[in-house]
Amino acid sequence: MSRWNGVPAVVLAAGFIAMNCCFSTAAEELPQPAFPCSRETIARGVASRFIDGRTFILDDGREVRLAGIEVPPPPSPMQRGTAPEGAAARDALAGLLAGSEVVLRQAEPQKTDRYGRIVAHAFTARDGVERSVQADLIAARHARVTARAGNRACARELLGRENAARRAKLGLWATSYYDSLDADNPADVLAEQGRFALVEGKVVSVRESGATIYVNFGRRWSKDFTVTILKRNARNFTAAGLEPKTLAGRRVRVRGWIEERGGPLIEAARPEQLELTDRE
């Protein structure tokens, strides 16, 4: 059963009323300096149709997926109940882009994904100022950061905006559904297999085996939550102040896609997937 079904409707309603009343001013709450996600322009156009909170169709038929963020899925006829967060994210994207030219800037080495969608950072101009669509969606509490943002400075910028949005406890952060899962409850983590999630807990040990580093959040490797880091990527974590062997005893928030390898697991390919939270 999805964690969505356990969220009281009155809590969601209150959260989304607050979110909707604050959306028009959310961007002003987080002023945007020179933006590190701005790179080579790869396309321009006007959005004509919106699939969900991060996917839209340009007027020439090309499909675009916003890089670096995850949003709730839109309501589906096959889904039990309703998903107001998904509809709110899609409506927010439409509000940001409808009728305006959108500039798409390269986010990853490959400009399109395996489905042929352009993967990009999107920008619009308002009052003569260029604004990041991803940053505005995060600031308005409609999206979470995946850390696949194209470069580390960009990921750090988006993570900072997400943390500010989380502290406001509005939108996605009004309920526990989209906040961090507890690493001490591996069954709850495993229930999200195949989905993007945030997981937080205290690291019990760090071990190496073959080409992999195992960051263990429990003593039972076959049941407890684990994060894996390939040794060839370890220097990137060390350069970011996250040397794997020093994580034991620290409280860490991890983001990524939940897999099952005995117990629940996230593979961390980028240091931006890990945040130290014992000093928050």
Name these PLM-found stretches.
Residues 10-14:
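Sec-dependent N-terminal signal peptides
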Residues 2-9, 19-280:
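Small beta-barrel nucleic-acid-binding modules, primarily SNase/OB-fold domains
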